[in-house]
Amino acid sequence: VGKLQVTGWGNTRRITIIINDMKKTKIVATISDKRCEVEFLEKLYRAGMNVVRLNTAHQDMEQALKVVENVRKVSDNIAILIDTKGPEVRTMLMDEPMHVDRGETIYLTGDPELKMEGKLIHVSYPYFAEDIKVGDKVLVDDGDVELVVVEKKDHYLEMMVTNEAVIKNRKSVNVPGASLKLKSLSDKDRAFIDFAIDNNLDFIAHSFVRNKEDVMAIQAILDARGSKIKVIAKIENQEGVDNIDEILDYAYGVMVARGDLGIEIEAEKIPKIQRYIVKKCIESKKPVIIATQMLHTMIEHPRPTRAEISDIANAVYMGTDAIMLSGETAYGAYPEEAVTVMREVAEENEGTVPPDAGRSLVRINNEITAALARSAVKTALMLPIKAIVVDTLSGRTARYLSAFRSDLPVYARCYNERVMRELALSFGVYPYYTEKPMSRDEFMNDLPEMLMQNGIKADDYVVVVGGSFGHGKGASFIEVCKIGEIR
């Protein structure tokens, strides 16, 4: 990720990233308050981490704040993403674990007052018996226990156990294919959204997004407080997959959360769903993250399996913007090595993706910025171009260039540190920050120094995408320049 150089002139502060890590695929790393020392975070940053993820299922606000403060001591360039828990159902009111045998009959209810003979399990959703049908499968504890609905009663379900297991308190309950009337946001979620706003975080990844309304529920809170935090929709069930188009209309980006997705949907369908969602995100010019168990072996072992290496490479081949580590960096024994493996696999395999991969998917939708972005990428293919450079106020032009998946680096000059961090989730974009918005001449005259710091020579050519250099104008021109001749 290179060294951070801070320079300035007059009252203007400029941050220039000198990039040693030239992977285009971004890396998200989950960080726990149990291990978030500044030195540790610096190692992950140097290894290739672009975004820090906080998992609110395992942290309170004091613990999360500790991570945030330490990340900010490392670099303003690292984005911070916080997960909500989202709508979920869990077992509850169990004083002790319950052993169940294959073929045994047990009972499930959402009524906390219900008592009866036999093995009864309470769950945290009051309409459970109402929403579930005879024949539905109910999966407990991340799928370790499978139950089948045999008969429906007014306030409980009669279930048959299909495998011997032990059911414990506060374990997850999933019903593949069922549409439950769960609230999108819990009280804890709302509190953490306020925490994210108060601490100027960059992304909120909302769990179990089923439709546009789930995204809008968070956006309404953000809008009411004037927050610019971007919403990432975590797709974790069939309903989310089915409604991906409307979700993409309202979310900033998408995370393919394969853990719960693989419980809610048959595991053998996950690869094609992953490919489908990545394709949809590229079409919509929205960032996409592939997550869960990418280097699971490295939680305990220093080297990954060949299958894990292939999993990362396949995500790169599909054209994902980012890949994510969970337990590997949160509590695993080899966190720095895991980030390094991800970076090395991404770097090695990005160059083997066909030059036009995904490029034809992107929808222009009569947008001038999108048309210019496509023209810039096509121009770079036809000429001996070394880089694409963009001046961006909102980050939109840089994101659109990213969507066309150029095999050249896209250097994005940003005038807002939040925009710079938002681009930490965009494939192939290397954002850098300048406090003072520039005129066109200032922008062009400043390019040679930055580009040559990043290995581009005076006789190299670049494509410049720019606009009217004013708020709300957007990109309006592309220009091919020889670095040594810019005046």
Task: Please report, for each region that a protein language model flagged, where it lies by residue.
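Non-catalytic helical/linker scaffolds that mediate oligomerization, partner binding
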Residues: I19-R487
